[in-house]
Amino acid sequence: MAKEEEEFKATMKIEILEEDKFKVRFILYDAPIAFANSFRRAMKSLVPVMAVDYIDVYLNSSYLFDENLAHRIGLIPIKTELDRFNLPENCVCGGEGCPNCQVSFRLNVEGPKVVYSGDFVSDDESIKPAFDNIPIIELFKGQQLMIEAVARLGTGKEHSKFQPVSICAYKIIPEIDIKDSCNNCNACVEACPRGVFENKNGKIVVKDVLSCSMCMECVKSCEEDAIELTETNNYLFTVEGVGQLPVKKVMIEALKIIREKASEMNKLIEELV
């Protein structure tokens, strides 16, 4: 087992295919499927980000109940600086609340107007809603809101509002072997719903292996049994961020967390042995 782990360490790598502010597509090469799934789970559930934990409502003359407002406000993504704040359970204040683990936002608005996330005023200029144009409620004439919201770090394992990514999925990239017995009948080209194959100069070839979903329609359609699909240790990931952190930062933090957890497990095993 140790030898297999060393082989994976030596060959495992990531290739970025597509990257923008909110989305990254990449290939994870030569990794066990257990690691690929751990990576996915860590990005979604273990990387901490800021979100509103609770609100104090001083005045609400709108048509919406306080708890409905709290729910909407809690789901607003907030820009996060992990190097400046602690998780409540790791803070010197013991989770009671201090500038090292929480930030307060104030909202004081009067209708008629649509209240947006950008109307909140933060105690910390660098910690604010990731988007200013998220609508919260429409106030009519005479209606008013006075609210203080307190944000802290948390993880998606605790609540979905702390998830730094929305889409975080991977699929296995197969190895597709077209044997010499192929008679180039085009049956696989017509059967494949994703356009993986093409007839090039009278010969069937793989055009886009990354689009393959391993639905096996090509194998079923081939009367010559000339197509063989084999699972590999390569995975195509698609990750979309919510806005609190850059997606690449989420990836890096997730890998750090996996390493820390692996180190903790090694220590526990050594103690038992």
Predicted regions and their residues:
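Protein-protein interaction/assembly regions in multi-subunit complexes
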Residues: 1-273
